[in-house]
């Protein structure tokens, strides 16, 4: 079950939910350039909300392989206007900011974002976890290795479940003294792992469900899907739905996706099993 508090509200979901991806970048691997204007971003947000997404995840810094990382000022200029505009037009929407920078997270939270989705799990910015911990902000802690520039060079093998669990434990120790936290775990499927390791993480979520925290699975159009199927990222929506269904059957609490409608259908059907 997913439960968290934000902006003096408590949110409780008794079944898995969708986190819809809103990339306001010119260079994201799947949808770069589509929604980096305020009007197109707002329209896409409205579409995803109408399709049933529970959370909108706003990202302004692409971390695709072999891509130059946006500067802090570039990321800030991309995400803040979008957070402000969406919060104004959809005051009840749950907003997440996809960033590994504490400064961006803090700025977005002050403008009405609810969740920080950190692909580094606090690894890339030493100020992130203290900020999250002191303010008890809902926080997606993703497993990651290396740096923004090198993380895709890794291909972790072996006991991947234990590797991911150890990472969660170590990062959690850094904020545990600051009181109860609102952590959501993300195993980082597609980040520094072999295709076999990605499937292993997808098929046995309970092996790394640390402390009973909810688990987010973000596999939408990832390379382990389209490489296995021999298709392009844009052609991988059917494969994504199959993989998301596997995740749901294994206990996923949040699906982070580009195509909200297909994910909602997967949740609806699996809820009858």
Question: What kind of feature is each model-predicted range?
Answer:
Residues 6-7, 13, 30-39, 43-44, ...:
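Active-site-adjacent loop and "lid" segments of alpha/beta metabolic enzymes
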